[in-house]
Amino acid sequence: MSLGIDISTWQDVRDYGTLLGQVDYVLLKASGSNTGSNYVDSKYHRHANAIGGRKPTGSYYMNGASDATSAARFFVSNLNSNADDFAVLDIETIDGYAYWSPAKSLEWVHEVRRLGYTGPVFAYMNTSVAQSADWSALERAGVGLWLANYGQDNGSLTSPSPGAGSWSTWQVHQYTQQGRLAGYAGPLDLNRAKAGIFTSMPSANDPATFWSAKRWIISGLAG
């Protein structure tokens, strides 16, 4: 499987070259509404421009106060072209806001695609959220599961079979918040992705049958 990190305003990366040399892809926090209104993460564009296309890079939106349509429009309008290889909706209870329902989450996905985004789309959630609702409508729409399940959360993989709740399977597994990699002094979220998922998720044109290869091919990572 391939190794990836996700970073946001909390990660003040200085040595991007060393850090990128150890990972296969990067997910950046782009925007969200968990503070009460839509905002752009303060380090989003810095991270995206520093990475500069050297690795497959995606962006995520954190759910919160906004309605789904406005949130999708805000996300797309602020999407950095250096970080548009895949899109992720972060679905979680945070800062007093309940996690978005499957219907609201699907509305966000549909609006993102209506606005012209054709890359792979994922829904990020922990095991509890994955088990607490029926997410099959998102899966039928071609959305993949980015599952957070940390096990012992000690920097290593301690939950090799995390399950998938109401989903048929997961595509990416965030397995620790305590990862350590050269090039960054603090803890990092580490993720393992199944081989080829960033180029084999269904496209917006025909989720059931058309498999897109947007910009990158992650090769040699089967496992």
Name every feature range the model reports, one short phrase each.
Residues 1-17, 136-216:
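Functionally critical loop-and-helix segments that line ligand-binding/catalytic clefts
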Residues 1-118, 141-142:
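Substrate-binding cleft of extracellular glycoside hydrolase catalytic domains
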Residues 30, 48, 52, 79, ...:
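Sec/Tat-exported extracytoplasmic proteins
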Residues 61, 90, 123, 147-149, ...:
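Structural signal for conserved beta-strand scaffold positions within catalytic alpha/beta enzyme cores
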Residues 65, 93-95, 125-130, 151-152:
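Short beta-alpha junction loops
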Residues 70, 129-140:
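Glycine-rich, charge-decorated loop segments at or immediately adjacent to ligand/cofactor-binding or catalytic sites
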Residues 117-132, 144:
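Aromatic-lined carbohydrate-recognition surfaces of secreted/lumenal glycan-active proteins
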Residues 215-223:
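C-terminal, disordered and strongly charge-biased linear tails with low hydrophobicity
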